[in-house]
Curated annotation (Swiss-Prot):
Reactions mediated catalytically: 5-O-(1-carboxyvinyl)-3-phosphoshikimate = chorismate + phosphate
Keywords: Amino-acid biosynthesis, Aromatic amino acid biosynthesis, FAD, Flavoprotein, FMN, Lyase, NADP
Species assigned in the record: Laribacter hongkongensis (strain HLHK9)
UniProt keyword Lyase, yes or no: yes
Listed name of the protein: Chorismate synthase
Length: 366
């Protein structure tokens, strides 16, 4: 299976399946000398791990990370960093009834036609379980970006179903199970998710992730544009079906006089571009939004076919997130950080000595 490596200079190669002994990744290209320990990575993993509330899968995985290589006396050595997370709460018997059928909305049908073999236990390689190692790798990227450039990458949920979640403060995001930046609608969200779960159904979500203090100049024009790589990274997250940069699809109703971000000596007047112009960072906040589809695994009878192409009615049992978007925020943060560190290293390699007389203006006026 190809397509398991992400990045150019800072690369992440992941491995493992949902119900295998372990999942893990190898991070290559990390600059030497970065102080990193398992606790730094564990903090990010704990934000994503399952079983943290009744609104997510009840699979109980501690997601304890082990650093196997690439770190000596608490610092990265510049050699490959191997990270391992052991699976401890698999319940493969829940998937015995789907070995010869294809779950609607899942990768079962496509994996079977592509490879001629598939692991039905928890979705195997296509499971969102794999994203834990992306969060682990992203923790390393986040720490380097923060220490080297003061970059902060953070996200929050903006919508579940038809419930919009306004933004009030970043300080609120990690105080509730929904990664919400406003707590005024928590009771409504709790009741809504309870009703979704009791009806044996699932629901979609929307989230936003922001990178602050990104310098101007990162990104490669044409094919490796910064926004193109960000969209590529986000679309590689399970269940993501749409990505917007800045105003995104909202630009359809904007006029050029409104959408174009004017520049003044004091700074940009707006940020409809989402911090990227011509595929290169502007120095403003990079703002990304994404739409996440409803969980495909639901305990409702649905039509499908078996391997022989015969019609079947099937229900998907097991432990599943009624809204996969709830736990997607740390994953999206990690993927944005991985894109940024890769472009930081690429920029340093080609254009690190470039200096111009024009000062970098503020990200936004007011």
């Amino acid at each position: 299976m190809s397509g398991n490596t992400f990045g150019h200079l800072f690369t992440v190669t992941s491995f493992g399946e949902s119900h295998g002994p372990a999942i893990g990744c190898v991070v290559d290209g990390c600059p030497p000398g970065l102080a990193i320990c398992e606790a730094d990575i564990q903090r990010e993993l704990d934000r994503r791990k399952p079983g943290t509330s009744r609104h997510v899968t009840q699979r109980r995985e501690p997601d304890t990370v082990e650093i196997l290589s690439g770190v000596f006396e608490g610092k990265t050595t510049g050699t490959p960093i191997a990270l391992l997370i052991r699976n401890q709460d698999q319940r493969s018997k829940d998937y015995g009834n789907i070995a010869d059928t294809f779950r609607p909305g899942h990768a079962d049908y496509t994996y079977w036609h592509k490879y001629g073999i598939r692991d039905p236990r928890g979705g195997g390689r296509s499971s969102a379980r794999e994203t834990a190692v992306r969060v682990a790798a992203g923790a390393i990227a986040k720490k380097w970006l923060s220490e080297r450039f003061g970059i902060v990458v953070r996200g929050h949920l903006t919508q579940i179903g038809d419930i919009d979640i306004p933004f009030t403060s970043w300080d609120l995001v990690d105080t509730n199970p929904f990664f919400a930046a406003d707590t005024s609608r928590l009771d409504e969200l709790e009741a809504y998710m309870d009703s979704i779960r009791k009806s044996c159904d699932s629901i979609g979500a929307r989230l936003r992730v922001v990178a602050e203090n990104v310098p101007v100049g990162w990104g490669e024009p044409v094919f490796d544009r910064l926004d193109a790589d960000i969209a590529y990274a986000m679309m590689g997250i399970n269940a993501v079906k749409g990505v917007e940069i800045g105003a995104g699809f909202g630009c359809v109703t904007q006029r050029g006089s409104e959408h174009g971000d004017e520049l003044t000596p004091e700074g940009f007047v707006s940020n409809h571009a989402g911090g990227i112009l011509g595929g290169i960072s502007t120095g403003q906040h990079i703002e990304v939004s994404m739409a996440i589809k409803p969980t495909s695994s639901i305990a409702r009878p649905r039509r499908s076919i078996d391997r022989q192409g015969q019609p079947v009615n099937m229900e998907t049992h097991g432990r599943h997130d009624p809204c996969v978007g709830i736990r997607a925020t740390p994953i999206a943060e990690a993927m944005l950080a991985l894109v940024l560190i890769d472009h930081a290293l690429r920029h340093r390699a080609q254009c690190g000595d470039v200096r111009v007389e024009t000062p970098q203006i503020a990200g936004r006026v007011g």
